[in-house]
Structures are given as C-alpha cells and as structure tokens.
Amino acid sequence: MANVVVIGAQWGDEGKGKITDLLSRSADVVVRYQGGVNAGHTVVVGEQTLKLHLIPSGILYPDTQCIIGSGTVIDPKVLLGEVEMLEQLGISTDHLLISQTAHVTMPYHRLIDQASEQQRGSHKIGTTGRGIGPTYADKSERTGIRILDLMDPEGLREQLTWTIAQKNVILDKLYGLPPLDAESVIEEYSGYAERLRPHVVDSSLTIDEAWRKRKNILFEGAQGTLLDLDHGTYPYVTSSNPVAGGACIGAGVGPTIIDRVIGVAKAYTTRVGEGPFPTELHGDIGELLCQRGAEFGTTTGRRRRCGWFDAVIGRYAVRINGIDCLAITKLDVLDDLDEIQVCVAYDIDGERCDHFPSSARSFANCQPIYKTVPGWKQSTSHCRNLEDLPKAALDYLKFLAELMEVPIAIVSLGASRDQTIIVEDPIHGPKRALLHTNGDSSAS
C-alpha cells in the first residue's frame, strides 16, 4: 500500500491531470484537496479529450472512489455540469463523493472577484474571476456557506438572507453593482442541494476507513507550488495551499499517512496571468513553445506565458513539498530546438543567488543565469523507453534531475496515456532522503 500526493512543481498547468490519470489505475481512492473551478485539468483517452475543473481525474476508473475534499471550494453549477457531461459520455459518477465541509462559491463571490480585479487597474493579480478568493475569504471570516449548509433548507434560508443583505451593501457601495435577489439565490442553490445530496459524505471519515483497510490513496493537488498562498510568488498566488502539506488539511488526514510525494513539471516553464517570470521568452522561441505545447488555459482559455526551465524554482518546489521523484511532461515540445537553455541560478544586482527569493519585488529583479545544452532535432513523441530517446534528450533529463536533486520517474511525450515512459516505479520507489544520502540523482 502507498498513499501518494501529486503536486505541481511550477506555476500550475504542468500536466498533473495526465499523471494523476496514469497513477489512478493503481489507486483505490483519489482525493482532490484544494482549489476550485479556477483550476482545470485535461485528460485524453483515445479520441476523447476531457476537461475537468472540480472532479478528480480518477473518475474515469469506475472502481476508484473519487473525493472532492473539504479544502476545496465548490461551484455547484459547474460541478453538476461536469457530472452531466461525463454521464452523457457514458462515464458513471456514482463513485464521486463530496465533502460535507467543503465551502460553496456563491454568485456574490464571482461578482466581487470580477469587480475587485477590475478595480485594481494596473495592479491586477490575474484572478480567473470565478469567485475563488472571495469564497476562501468568507471561509476565513467564518461567514461562508458549506455543502452541509445546503442540505439544511431552513438554516440555508436564514444564513443566505443575512449574508446576501451584507454582500448587497458591498456590491452597491464599493462597486456600484445592482443587488442580488435573495429569494432567487436561495431557490437556485436549494435545487443544487437535492442533486448533490447522494454524493455528500464525511470525507475525512471515508478516507480514514480506506486507510484502515490499507487502500491506496492518491491526493491530487490543483495549480502549483509557486501559486501557493503561503509559499508562492505572493501576491500573485491562489487563495489555497497546493503544496503537499495542503493535502493533509484539505483532505482531513494526518501527515504520517503520506508515503510519497510526486512533483510534476514541464520540460520548460509556463505561467498564466500576472507576476514575475524570470525565464519568460517573448520572441520566436516563446511563440513556438506556446503553439507546440498548446499553451492555453483549460479554465479561462488565456494564453500561457512560456519560458525556459527554471531549476531554481524547481529546487524550491522539491524543498517545500519534500518531493521524492519527478514527472517531466511535454518533453516533445522541445523536439525542434537547436539548443535549449536552463536557468541554474539568478543574478540579483550583480550577485549570484541559488535560491528562490520570498519578495515579489526581488524576484522581479532576478536575471536568469543560463546553462545552454544541445537540442536533439528529432521527434520523441513515439518513444516508449529511455533507450528510444535521442542521446541529447536523455542528457537533458539527466541534467534536470541533477539540478533538482531528485530522480525522474515518469517522462510524458504527448497528451495521450500511451505517450509515456515509466523510468522507475513512481509510487514505491525509495524516499528522497535516502537518494540524497547516497548521492543518486540520475534520471535512469
């Protein structure tokens, strides 16, 4: 048995959906532990491309229990839309469970999110406008609506009547927006409650029961380490904790049940929205990465900013999450390049810096120090074993593993499940501390 956390080692969009889908084959339970509809993941199965925002990737496996944990924030309309989409494709959602203590995104959250971002002007932070930040803010202020509140009609009416009256003052006085009709919102969300009710459980208890039966549990993070509220490029971050430690809080488990952490990173780097990005490319190579990598957001459709691989933030992600091994995705996107650059350190005001700075202002002043390596100029999308890769591609992977000080367990060479090289067992491999002690950081 192994309980594994899958996290993004960059700014999100690393390909966690595909990796989680692959690992879900050997999982009994998959738990999404944070975030909301601001995060999207894409899974390609045969000719079908599924884009999901809330439902865990493991939903494609009928024997895998899929749980939306208490650390998430749920937009019921979007969630039920995903359920309907899957059922129309003949994919059952009977094995989908929803934490009763997850918070609910309401219409006023979306309105406040969008109006607040617009009001920021040139100081915007790049929110998706889906109401995630305001939902988490209400959670912290202890005024939020939880899934279990939806299940209590009288309590919901009382709570929403008071809350909407308060939010209408904010909408009017602060943003100049028309008020919401409380009765309409109560009626709408009461309808959602009845459709969600069969899926609602005490998720912490459900996960504990699975653990006691020695089931394999996979914890699925959304977004990435550099978007973490506490450890990311603040203030250009999300409102939750995508890091591995967030899995315990967002799922309702103790840290001792986590056996392994798998970090997912692209073979280059992308970022959506605002914020510093030292290795960002603005010319032809940046455009090539964007087009070949289809770098457009699953949630918003926004064009992703593209740049070279940044080993400084990679090492930071390894440290913050305790990453045991890596899954490197989209290696094939680099196939046509004559040479590839990797950021190995930063120059800040003439001094070398090997570590990620906590200040966004300092990070914005970082100039990347690059190591240039040769490209391989041939297709890798057909490769299924390390031996099939061009030597330069294999050398590139080894270089990344050395810089990150963890082994590479999975290499993804395309969106399909079969476009994957399993280098070593990502679930049952040795712990990072042992690898570090032995000095073993190669990719093979």
Swiss-Prot record:
CDD domains: AdSS. Mg(2+) binds at D13, G40. It is an enzyme of class 6 (ligase). GTP binds at residues 12-18, 40-42, 304, 330-332, 412-414. The active site is at D13 (proton acceptor), H41 (proton donor). It comes from the Bacteria. It catalyses: IMP + L-aspartate + GTP = N(6)-(1,2-dicarboxyethyl)-AMP + GDP + phosphate + 2 H(+). The keyword S-adenosyl-L-methionine does not apply. One of its GO terms (molecular function) is magnesium ion binding. IMP binds at D13, E14, G15, K16, N38, A39, G40, H41, T128, R142, Q223, T238, R302. Pathway: Purine metabolism; AMP biosynthesis via de novo pathway; AMP from IMP: step 1/2. Its EC number is 6.3.4.4. GO terms for cellular component: cytoplasm. Its cofactor is Mg(2+). Keywords: Cytoplasm, GTP-binding, Ligase, Magnesium, Metal-binding, Nucleotide-binding, Purine biosynthesis. Substrate binds at T298, T299, T300, G301, R302, R303, R304. Its main location: cytoplasm. Binds 1 Mg(2+) ion per subunit. It is found in: Cytoplasm. One of its GO terms (biological process) is 'de novo' AMP biosynthetic process. SUPFAM superfamilies: P-loop containing nucleoside triphosphate hydrolases. Plays an important role in the de novo pathway of purine nucleotide biosynthesis. Catalyzes the first committed step in the biosynthesis of AMP from IMP. Belongs to the adenylosuccinate synthetase family. Homodimer. This is Adenylosuccinate synthetase. It comes from Synechococcus sp. (strain ATCC 27144 / PCC 6301 / SAUG 1402/1) (Anacystis nidulans). The lineage of its organism: Bacteria, Bacillati, Cyanobacteriota, Cyanophyceae, Synechococcales.
